[in-house]
Amino acid sequence: MLDTFRKEIPLLADYQPDKDVVPTNSQVFRVYVERYLTSLPVVNQDLDLIISQLQSTEYGVPVQIYFFSRKIWKEYERIQSDIFDHFFAMIPKFELKVYQYSD
């Protein structure tokens, strides 16, 4: 799995998990998200950038993505939408699925 990710996804080409860690697809996806965000000039690297896995539920495992833009609020909304569109397009490469729950 990891070799495939390294070959197909340039941002993961040099990824080496910690010793004694068997990486999962969700772990590698979180690494990808962090690397992707740090590669974007619109993301403010001087402020917090956090990608965390939240408590799993009967619907799945939520991932929280927290970052700041270098732009004003109105532009942030567009930037955020573009970034999430990119993540939605990349998720199948990690053999993951998006699930939306609504009442």
Task: Write out the residue ranges for each language-model feature.
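Structured, soluble regulatory/oligomerization domains located on the cytosolic or IMS-facing side
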Residues: 1-103
